[in-house]
Amino acid sequence: MLIENTNDRFGIVIDAGSSGSRIHVFKWQDTESLLHATNQDSQSILQSVPHIHQEKDWTFKLNPGLSSFEKKPQDAYKSHIKPLLDFAKNIIPESHWSSCPVFIQATAGMRLLPQDIQSSILDGLCQGLKHPAEFLVEDCSAQIQVIDGETEGLYGWLGLNYLYGHFNDYNPEVSDHFTFGFMDMGGASTQIAFAPHDSGEIARHRDDIATIFLRSVNGDLQKWDVFVSTWLGFGANQARRRYLAQLINTLPENTNDYENDDFSTRNLNDPCMPRGSSTDFEFKDTIFHIAGSGNYEQCTKSIYPLLLKNMPCDDEPCLFNGVHAPRIDFANDKFIGTSEYWYTANDVFKLGGEYNFDKFSKSLREFCNSNWTQILANSDKGVYNSIPENFLKDACFKGNWVLNILHEGFDMPRIDVDAENVNDRPLFQSVEKVEERELSWTLGRILLYASGSILAGNDDFMVGIAPSERRTKLTGKKFIPGKLLESDQLRKQSSSLSNKGFLMWFAIICCIFYLIFHRSHIIRRRFSGLYNITKDFKTGIRRRLKFLRRSDPFSRLEEGELGTDVDGFKDVYRMKSSSMFDLGKSSATMQREHEPQRTASQSANLAPSNLRPAFSMADFSKFKDSRLYD
């Protein structure tokens, strides 16, 4: 248990991923107390976002993932989330529990579940957190939710640049603030988020750029324009599956007009696996035997079509799979990659950190062209950090996929980190930790909350994330507030407006009743027809009020009495919380996760000016002759 400090503030973020849920406990100082600091570092503190602290042992993971409760959503809180919160109770002083917000942010696995199952699980978590209400839960729809890939990418960008101190010593009068671009490659998707250095590119692509608002301790507003995009199906594992399916689908018997010979070839050669290695792959209920042929050049060329560079874009420059983005100025826009960018480079090739194309491609070539027995012998010697054999079999493909994404997908130049035009930072570097702290998007979420809790400064702008205009139009995506109580303020404002409206209508109704009851003789003479209508209306109201006094079934519904009929309608009304209604937008939001396959009608809607062929031999002219690498 921590030594209690009344100025401490705590926050909890649970990353509910596909394989498991990991809780993160964070701490920062009350910003009001920092305003009165008088030490020599006070000026720097005031011009920075709150300092978020996390000890190494303030995280804990529980397997399997939240999505595993799809058959028993009612058990998700007690069996999965409560043990994580019990872990947090051993860190956070009890006096701080009620003021400690909990964010349960579900990602990969939950995104794949049907909407009704998502809602059932999340609604059960909301009820579990509120009864009993040990931690701060203001709004379930904002705190317990499935987040899309873009939101996850923006949180990752926030967490990355916070760890590098790019939100500290902020001068609002300076327009040029450096930040790192964020690249993340998981098993299912890949993401990019960066603040373009070129203001002209921001202006040209304004409708594609999100805006992040932070607040320094002294109240100064920090405004960051960030482009973000995510590609579902372009993660390392899903790309591998698409690649093997491509090998099968290109067989002659699978492309002719005869169905009786489909899948007659069950043995295939894979240039992206080391020679002598083998594996089985199931495709359309058929098992295929894959044998490695170990050819680096052929592997690189075979992978290139998976980027779908031929997909039409509605604007330029075009990245891949029909996604356009602001032009990346690699002379000034520098990037950091995590997850697969780090694991592949570091665990297999010992080349994590600053990226060097020549060194990485040479090591990858040697590995891909090696015999499987030699790779196993190296593994026994500890060369590959004790990576399991099935991971080693995929390492050649994953290394090539990383190269293709970086240089063909994002058009990153193939230059060394010590080249003259790289300035003082490398074009790209892969990391797992920054200053001994794990790089996690959860840090970005709690930073947004802590920054939004600052009371100093102008209230004209709320701390949070404003989605791009395009996302708002296409999916209805809304502003993500940093501070939970913003919703309370909005409700208060709405309530205030409602009260004013109620008073106005009440005054009008009083005037009407005065005319009806006190000047009815005038009304009858001049507006006898209108009077009769009014009289009938009053009679109907009296009858309705009499009925309502006798029975109010809908009020009983609100109280939870669902066992009785409601005017003969049985089992028609299904009770849902506000969070369940809000979650209906998540499926639309996922459309931004650019799936690798798109229907013809969708492609036609993009109205491209220039269509590129899928690929031709000209596409391979960029690959150097293998003799140049030997």
UniProtKB/Swiss-Prot annotation:
UniProt-listed Gene3D superfamilies: 3.30.420.40, Exopolyphosphatase. Domain 2
GO biological process: CTP metabolic process; protein glycosylation; sphingolipid metabolic process; UDP catabolic process
Protein localization: Golgi apparatus; Membrane
UniProt note on regulation of activity: Activity is inhibited both by interaction with VMA13 and by V-ATPase acidification of the lumen. The activity of VMA13 is not required for YND1 inhibition.
Catalytic activity: a ribonucleoside 5'-triphosphate + 2 H2O = a ribonucleoside 5'-phosphate + 2 phosphate + 2 H(+)
Membrane topology listed for this record: Single-pass membrane protein
Gene Ontology CC, one term: Golgi apparatus
Active site: 152 (proton acceptor)
Pathway: Protein modification; protein glycosylation
Membrane topology (Cytoplasmic): 518-630
Positions on the Lumenal side per record topology: 1-500
InterPro entries from the UniProt entry: GDA1_CD39_NTPase
Summary of the knockout phenotype: Cells are partially resistant to E4orf4 and can partially suppress the spindle checkpoint defect in CDC55 deletion mutant. Does not suppress the rapamycin-resistance of CDC55 deletion mutant. YND1 and CDC55 double mutant is fully resistant to E4orf4. Deletion mutant suppresses the synthetic lethality of triple mutants, where UPC2 and ECM22 are knocked out along with either HAP1, ERG6 or ERG28.
Major location category of this protein: Golgi
Transmembrane feature ranges: 501-517
Additional record remark: Present with 450 molecules/cell in log phase SD medium.
Function text: Catalyzes the hydrolysis of phosphoanhydride bonds of nucleoside tri- and di-phosphates. Has equal high activity toward ADP/ATP, GDP/GTP, and UDP/UTP and approximately 50% less toward CDP/CTP and thiamine pyrophosphate. Has no activity toward GMP. Required for Golgi glycosylation and cell wall integrity. Together with CDC55, required for adenovirus E4orf4 (early region 4 open reading frame 4) induced toxicity, the apyrase activity is not required for this function. Plays a role in sphingolipid synthesis.
Protein name per Swiss-Prot or TrEMBL: Golgi apyrase
Source organism of the structure: Saccharomyces cerevisiae (strain ATCC 204508 / S288c) (Baker's yeast)
Lineage of the organism: Eukaryota, Fungi, Dikarya, Ascomycota, Saccharomycotina
